[in-house]
């Protein structure tokens, strides 16, 4: 591709919240704390599951993969946001913007499918406990995880390559916190109708279909919970399901609002706030919701902490 014939833009400017300079320092502090807590929470989960052989079962190995995705997702996005918030104008090269968009789509797409696989795993465990070892054997688990990662790679490769094959004639100011498809697409000086059809169809398949499957799985799970004889058990199960559904609704709902119609009528500031839900909040909440409330995870964490204290004592 001859870049000079197709595009005169060699770098982009990320504007961030430049319309609200008085808020940027406070936002920098909040985002930094969220980033550190996200990394720590997901790192703890990764270490706990990796070191405890008894947790090497599909349920926890799915969590391990989710934690890797969340750490990677945050590492691709948040440092750039912090730079944007700490400077008046942040420059990012054409190649740098391409790379960031690619990895955002890779990890975001992988998470969409991975959360669906995790919901299926919980559905099989709760609704078909006797057949669970057969339904979710190691082979099925590996296929679901590999499918999630390969799907994420394919989504990222197709969408990013397509977006950056368009000509960019200027202006080069991206009114966003990072290089994401919708705000970058607004700078394209060509007809993007076919891409928008692809984006609409792709979002339905990648975001809406897994989300609907998750909802159906949890409806079946809720019916199974209602049959539990123990009131305490029902309350605990309902609480867990409610927190899981809150997390997936936040993630899929906001991602759907962003990607279903890339050139939607939302204001730039609204788009930024929506994007923060699935780029900042869900990576922060998922460790708390999926893992740190889990009794087995907490027991393992306490054991590791005690072992560390004993080693330091001697």
Swiss-Prot record:
It is found in: Cell membrane. Disulfide bonds join 97-189. InterPro entries: GPCR_Rhodpsn, GPCR_Rhodpsn_7TM, Olfact_rcpt. Keywords: Cell membrane, Disulfide bond, G-protein coupled receptor, Glycoprotein, Membrane, Olfaction, Receptor, Sensory transduction, Transducer, Transmembrane, Transmembrane helix. GO terms for molecular function: G protein-coupled receptor activity; olfactory receptor activity. Belongs to the G-protein coupled receptor 1 family. This is Olfactory receptor 10A3. It comes from Homo sapiens (Human).
